[in-house]
Amino acid sequence: LKAIFNEYGANIPVTDKMRKKLLTLGVHLRDDTHFISIPERPFLRAGYDAYEGSLAKLMQSLVGQALAGTITPERALERAAKELKKHIQSHIEKGSFVPNSELTQKLKGGNHPLIDEKKLMDTLEYEVHMK
């Protein structure tokens, strides 16, 4: 869910339960605050776009190898997916994203958007399915 909220942004309705939780953390929301807005931080789309050229070259090479029979199509796709994952993780670490709000900085203890305990980066996975 965090990944989707960050990729596309979100307006999260503030519930009474959320207000109480934030109060325990020392954060008081104004009575007229009805949503918490998370800005768009497109790490997947922007990560792909940033490395599209090098990924296209890799894919050309892998397709050639698969056609020559030196690598299976499954292995070619596996290598391409692994490379894309590596580039997206790198983009998350280096990316220039909308800064965290003061509240988020206080809760996380830092201001590196998309990274707190590296859970998002560490949970990026891929699957190769052949039909």
Feature locations, PLM:
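Short, Lys/Arg-rich flexible segments
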Residues: L1-K131
